[in-house]
């Protein structure tokens, strides 16, 4: 008796159903996907179906046992994709992208972080696979070796296409121009599924890879015009206030502003920093702007005054580009440049990217004495790191531009008992609980570092810049964070938690006349601010930041996810909030006035990176200079 089509595909349908339900369960339990109405919930529920129907449906072209084996193999592969995204999301609050997958040189260093992020319940992801294997081996009813016909396959894939276009049409009606919002990965996953997002991400990757080949010097014109029109005059009174001094940048790992001037159980969390900012320029309204590249993104932003990419890390995707980074600019003023970081040189592709930035030296893990006794978590403890770095810095040619990158205050925030100077917090989040002791330890290490600079004679002739690189506590811990701060963590408050410390200390100047600067800004403004203090004119440079000390600086900054902040409003997740009250605004005109600027800045910066446009900049300046001289000669002749 001829078997019906449904009996032929019964094993496949069971696999699709199990994977569909599993994916929806992962959506609801592992990802924080905001749902506003029943339509969005329905879209979230059905969106995995078209992909699963397609990928499992390819088994219809196979015969016999190979069909079931393919289905089981695909179940394993799709499950791995789910698990990889779950683990990545637990720390980064984001979904994997293709550029992130190329960061394989980072994997060996993740060690304890990945172990901490895995949970026993993750084993439940294998239940459906076990069921399929059992059915394949034990149940003959699911071992059909009768091939499907051409008509059956045609009807099946026509149904798959109809499901896909129904999903896409519903999503477009709910969120118009959905596929133009490539920066909003949560929105894409919510509407087209995690799996279709990865396919879309692959298309984007191919498109962006072609941008460099198609770019030419004319591509820079719009960018130059925008940068020139939006550049603000620097603070003339402070221009050159730190001229000729050494620059010591300290990247404070995972340090957010909420710990500054805050206490835990009656004890200050950052006693040294609390005192240090009273002798410095303290910028209390500055936000980190990093994307998936985290610490490497912060380095990129600070050195280049460009935005990081929305997908992956620039340090991996575009390390071979030509840049106009701070080390290269300062080289013209006689500066020697160096990075000091007790980690592997290949981590975040730093060895290659630092060459592109123009750094003279990179002191990596091989420059340090690292032992089991002086290490914890991700590597060398901060106190040891600063102690050994000070010795290395004494031998640098002066003036120098240096960056020191700390490690101890890194997830999962491990700390030896003898280094614990403050008790852990008590909440349901072990991550937040352990965060405070590592921040306190980092603060103590900073105190010792400043003392060492004074002992070594490097303090008086330096400008010291301390900045937080990115968040340490993700929104996965908002319940515990709300408990600590004593308020609900709304989307507005979540943006406020992206504030990071920025402290500029100039001995002999800021200690005599300290300031608290409340101008809204981001890490992108650090380079222009620093260059002005050093007396370096950057009018000819392409940069999106402005001097934070300037009275003309616009109170505005945009985060990599498209959120933006002004002195009046905060925009995030499609909603506009009053900056003072944190309440949503019914009238969104105040946000609309800045929305285009936010999108344009991110887009233009992306064009520079993907097109490697700065390779044309020096030649373009020479061409423009020649044209000006030619015009002057013609004017004189006439």
From Swiss-Prot:
Ranges facing Cytoplasmic side: 1-4, 63-70, 138-153
Chain positions recorded as substrate binding sites: 410
Membrane topology field: Multi-pass membrane protein
GO CC terms: extracellular region; membrane; plasma membrane
Compartments, record wording: Cell membrane
Active site: 295
UniProt cross-references to Gene3D superfamilies, sorted A to Z: 3.30.1120.170, Alkaline Phosphatase, subunit A (3.40.720.10)
Positions in the Extracellular compartment: 26-41, 92-116, 175-638
Transmembrane segments: 5-25, 42-62, 71-91, 117-137, 154-174
GO molecular function: metal ion binding; transferase activity
Alphabetized UniProt keyword annotations: Cell membrane, Manganese, Membrane, Metal-binding, Secreted, Transmembrane, Transmembrane helix
Residues engaged in binding Mn(2+): 253, 295, 469-470
Record InterPro entries: Alkaline_phosphatase_core_sf, LtaS-like, OpgB/LTA_synthase_biosynth, Sulfatase_N
Post-translational modification: Proteolytically cleaved.
Residues the UniProt record annotates as site (Cleavage): 215-216
Keyword Manganese appears in the UniProt entry: yes
Keyword Nucleotide-binding: no
Similarity annotation: Belongs to the LTA synthase family.
Additional detail: Although its sequence similarity with the glycerol phosphate lipoteichoic acid synthase LtaS, it cannot restore staphylococcal growth and LTA synthesis after ltaS depletion.
Designated name of the protein: Lipoteichoic acid synthase-like YqgS
The organism of origin for this protein: Bacillus subtilis (strain 168)
Species classification: Bacteria, Bacillati, Bacillota, Bacilli, Bacillales
């Amino acid at each position: 008796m001829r078997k019906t089509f449904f009996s032929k595909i019964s094993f496949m349908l069971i696999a699709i159903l199990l994977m569909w339900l599993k994916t929806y369960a992962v959506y609801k339990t592992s990802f924080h996907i905001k749902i506003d109405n029943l339509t969005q919930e329905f879209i979230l529920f059905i969106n995995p179906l078209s992909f699963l129907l397609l990928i499992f449906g390819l088994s219809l072209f196979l015969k016999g046992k190979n069909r079931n084996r393919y289905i089981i193999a695909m179940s394993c592969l799709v499950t791995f994709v789910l698990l990889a995204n779950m683990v990545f999301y637990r720390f980064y609050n984001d979904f994997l992208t293709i550029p992130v997958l190329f960061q394989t040189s980072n994997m060996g260093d993740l060690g304890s972080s990945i172990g901490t992020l895995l949970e026993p319940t993750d084993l439940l992801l294998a239940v459906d696979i076990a069921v399929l294997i059992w059915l394949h081996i034990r149940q003959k009813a699911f071992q059909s070796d009768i091939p499907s016909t051409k008509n059956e396959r045609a009807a099946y894939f026509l149904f798959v296409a109809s499901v896909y276009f129904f999903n896409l049409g519903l999503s477009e009606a709910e969120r118009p121009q959905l596929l133009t919002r490539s920066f909003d990965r949560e929105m894409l996953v919510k509407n087209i599924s995690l799996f279709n997002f990865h396919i879309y991400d692959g298309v984007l990757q191919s498109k962006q890879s072609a941008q460099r080949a198609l770019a030419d010097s004319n591509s820079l014109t719009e960018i130059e015009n925008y940068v020139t029109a939006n550049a603000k005059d620097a603070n003339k009174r402070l221009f050159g206030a730190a001229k000729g001094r050494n620059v010591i940048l300290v990247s404070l790992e995972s340090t957010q502003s909420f710990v500054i001037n805050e206490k835990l159980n009656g004890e200050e969390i950052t006693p040294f920093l609390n005192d240090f900012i009273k002798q410095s320029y303290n910028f209390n309204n500055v936000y980190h702007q990093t994307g998936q590249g985290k610490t490497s993104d912060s380095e990129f932003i600070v050195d280049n005054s460009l935005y990081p990419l929305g997908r992956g890390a620039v340090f991996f995707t575009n390390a071979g580009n030509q840049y106009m980074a701070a080390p290269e600019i300062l080289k013209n003023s006689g500066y020697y440049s160096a990075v000091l970081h007790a980690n592997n040189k290949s981590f975040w592709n730093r060895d290659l990217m630092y060459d592109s930035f123009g750094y003279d030296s990179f002191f990596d893990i091989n420059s340090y004495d690292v032992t089991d006794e002086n290490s914890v978590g991700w590597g060398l403890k901060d106190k040891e790191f600063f102690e050994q770095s000070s010795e290395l810095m004494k031998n640098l040619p002066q003036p120098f531009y240096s960056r020191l990158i700390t490690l101890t205050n890194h997830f999962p925030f491990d700390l030896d008992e003898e280094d614990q100077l403050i008790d852990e917090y008590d909440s349901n989040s072990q991550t937040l609980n352990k965060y405070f002791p590592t921040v306190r330890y980092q603060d103590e290490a900073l105190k010792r570092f400043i003392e060492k600079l004074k002992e070594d004679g490097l303090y008086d002739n330096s400008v010291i810049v301390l900045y937080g690189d990115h968040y340490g506590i993700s929104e996965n811990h908002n319940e515990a964070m709300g408990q600590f701060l004593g308020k609900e963590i709304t989307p507005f408050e979540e943006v406020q938690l992206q504030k990071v410390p920025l402290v500029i200390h100039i001995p002999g100047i800021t200690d005599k006349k300290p300031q608290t600067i409340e101008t809204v800004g981001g890490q992108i403004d650090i380079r222009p601010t620093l260059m002005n203090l050093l007396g370096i004119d950057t009018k000819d440079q392409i940069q999106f930041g402005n001097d934070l000390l300037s009275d003309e600086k616009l109170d505005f900054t945009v985060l990599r996810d498209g959120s933006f902040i002004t002195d009046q409003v905060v925009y995030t997740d499609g909603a506009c909030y009053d900056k003072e009250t944190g309440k949503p605004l019914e009238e969104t005109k105040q946000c609309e006035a800045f929305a285009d600027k936010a999108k344009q800045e991110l887009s233009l910066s992306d064009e520079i990176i993907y097109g490697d446009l700065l390779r044309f900049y020096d030649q373009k300046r020479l061409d423009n200079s020649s044209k000006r001289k030619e015009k002057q000669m013609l004017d004189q002749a006439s």
